[in-house]
């Protein structure tokens, strides 16, 4: 691809991934023309919405699935290090947006909140203690605390300790105070507004991308439909970025690129219990993650979360899976069936055969009543009353199913996946957790993989936005502590001030 001063890029979707990428791109290439098309009437309506995403502020401080028990009994914390570094990278970029005036009021989207792990049972307590010792020895997590003392836990998680005095059983908890809660809906809306204000960007709502055609010169002709009038128009662009959440797989298939073959998706909704009693909500001030049931995927990790939504403290417990054919909460019941093609049907069937326990788990979750959900909640909060909680359905996640040399046909991919065409003109983001929390690292991966000819030119611009860019927060303790102190100041978190 010949390099010129200006390029056109179409961003599909106005969720956290598209707006993050767009916010970064307008800073490093202000002369490029950015066209954002969102099928709904405003940004952050699907999985980026604060009521639709599950846990937030994923920094591997309390999520036990990021620290893995090894056959020799040791605890592998390598994934936790990576996730933590990626969240630190996100905080740097958000801090830059605040300092540069692109977005305002950081406390509107990020708030300080302790992150706590809580387990019951002899084996789980041993796991948590071993995890604590492994993490405590590493600078990134050396502020972690651990206790098996119910009196200490009464101070950390008083709501959860109610009703346990007579028979507390074997339990333990670990805590890191310097966690956060992130309102990704509010952050996304702020970034979308900033992109709209950019002179070379347009953000159009109620506009749906319906087709693609690659031209002989390598550019793409993107067909866009106005959902209010039914009118269609064509936008010629150098690059297509598909950040449409659950809608990404069908759109990727429409491009016809070879990389879209042998891919499929399995849609899963999250359901949560939301507390409606302010007196209960006020007694809990933390994110508390438990241990996922044996043989179940990471999305099943139960957690009782303080969340800040519309400036108010709320309390959520879940998740509970809810399977349906829609790829988007505002999608069609035909989404799953339309995504089945002759070139991916064997991939999907292989996934079904390989993952019968997951299918059974999903079915069991679907038929679970509210009372069943409340019984799960009572393992965290024994005195929970039905009348204080409402069951609601959150957003959709589409688990990526693909063929890989290592795992064969029908491998279910957990996490966020970047797929691009061989000529790097089409880029799609697929998958889910910890997607939003690591969205900035995902955007950097997109830049590095698909725009190598700009690497030298862009590096100092990226370094200005993300001071640790090109360096390792995992290996450089001094830099890690410096960055944490700076982002805490920029985002008004109040940590590390002494």
Swiss-Prot record:
Record-given protein name: Probable malate:quinone oxidoreductase 2
Q: Tell me if Chloroplast is a UniProt keyword of this record.
A: no
User: Which top class of enzyme applies to this chain?
Assistant: oxidoreductase
One of the record's GO molecular function terms: L-malate dehydrogenase (quinone) activity
Q: What is its EC number?
A: 1.1.5.4
Catalysed reaction(s) here are: (S)-malate + a quinone = a quinol + oxaloacetate
Give one GO biological process term. Answer: tricarboxylic acid cycle
Task: Enumerate the SUPFAM superfamilies for this protein.
Answer: FAD/NAD(P)-binding domain (SSF51905)
Xref: PANTHER family: L-2-HYDROXYGLUTARATE DEHYDROGENASE, MITOCHONDRIAL
Identify the cofactor(s): FAD
Q: Which organism is it from?
A: Staphylococcus aureus (strain MW2)
Q: Does the keyword Oxidoreductase apply?
A: yes
Which keywords are on file for this protein?
FAD, Flavoprotein, Oxidoreductase, Tricarboxylic acid cycle
| NCBIfam families with a match to the protein in the record | Lac_Quin_Ox_NO, mal_quin_oxido, PRK05257.2-1, PRK05257.3-2, PRK13339.1
This protein's pathway reads: Carbohydrate metabolism; tricarboxylic acid cycle; oxaloacetate from (S)-malate (quinone route): step 1/1
Gene3D superfamilies named among the record's database cross-references: D-Amino Acid Oxidase, subunit A, domain 2, FAD/NAD(P)-binding domain
- Give the family, as the similarity comment puts it: Belongs to the MQO family.
Chain's gene name? mqo2
Which InterPro entries does the annotation name?
FAD/NAD-bd_sf, MQO
